[in-house]
Amino acid sequence: MKWSEISIHTTHEAVEAISNILHEAGAGGVVIEDPFELTKERETTYGEIYQLNPDDYPEEGVIIKAYLPVNSFLGETVEEIKQAINNLMLYNIDIGRNKITISEVNEEEWATAWKKYYNPVKISERFTIVPTWETYEPVSSDELIIELDPGMAFGTGTHPTTVMCIQALEKTVKKGDTVVDVGTGSGILSIAAAMLGAKRVHALDLDPVAVESAKLNVKLNKVHDVVTVSQNNLLDRMDEQADVIVANILAEIILRFVDDAYRLLRSDGVFITSGIIQTKKQEVKEGLLRAGFTIEETLTMEDWVAFIAKKQ
């Protein structure tokens, strides 16, 4: 089978949104080439050696590569992708150079092209993300392993916004909690919450592709008895009170349901928000405060911000 590789040179701010556009267009895998990977400090407790080739990364910005099957609809699909990316500017998202190139690869090249970017990664004090084809032994008794298949939609779980959410969940989720994950994507945050001891987790997403992806990952990680995955628009029609609500989505979307989050949380409940670029930090902070939340902690990683807010 022939595949078409679409390569988009953009900004850190636009990575999440463009990745979602590509997944929704039917991409069979997405690769993110971020030059930050070349200088990022990595866990070397056990003598690991990381060797990355600078030629695989842009000098500035980020390159997102997606793989689409070559068929009679390819031209139309590419045009729809271009239009959707341009529309991001309507939401004040900087798409940068937005240079788009297209090339053709065969099945074997595609299968190995994205695997080289994905290895077991320790993303927090307790969690390590492991690709499904890797054999990995926990290095301590309290290490928690999340298995993901990056050939499925919604990336590898190592984006800064996801990492900060998981770190925040580690600090806030208690045994027996009810957790709501808004915009679940791959389901990784719901899986983490279940592994941390939550009694009930509601994983919500409007995108049917995300719902199916999350269901598969939840089953893969054997937490399907705790996590319920549903197609839902934000917190619409949700009435069960929660101890923790987590949302790793665009700042503009967070502000749409901040009041609903406050209403749904129990007293002293926690609202974890991520997916916030630095330029939107103050806007989201003010929205949280207006809704009645207090900011317990602000997390930052690269150009991204996450808030841990509490209902009083």
Curated annotation (Swiss-Prot):
Function: Methylates ribosomal protein L11.
The entry's keywords: Cytoplasm, Methyltransferase, S-adenosyl-L-methionine, Transferase
Principal location class: cytoplasm
Pfam families: PrmA (PF06325)
Protein name: Ribosomal protein L11 methyltransferase
The keyword 4Fe-4S is assigned to this record: no
GO BP of this protein: methylation
CDD domains: AdoMet_MTases
Family: Belongs to the methyltransferase superfamily. PrmA family.
Gene behind the chain: prmA
Subcellular location: Cytoplasm
Keyword Methyltransferase: yes
Binding site for S-adenosyl-L-methionine: T162, G183, D205, N248
E.C. number(s) listed in UniProt: 2.1.1.-
SUPFAM superfamilies reported for this sequence: S-adenosyl-L-methionine-dependent methyltransferases (SSF53335)
Sample GO molecular function, one term: protein-lysine N-methyltransferase activity
TM regions (residue ranges): none
Catalytic activity reported: L-lysyl-[protein] + 3 S-adenosyl-L-methionine = N(6),N(6),N(6)-trimethyl-L-lysyl-[protein] + 3 S-adenosyl-L-homocysteine + 3 H(+)
Species: Anoxybacillus flavithermus (strain DSM 21510 / WK1)
One Gene Ontology CC term in the entry: cytoplasm
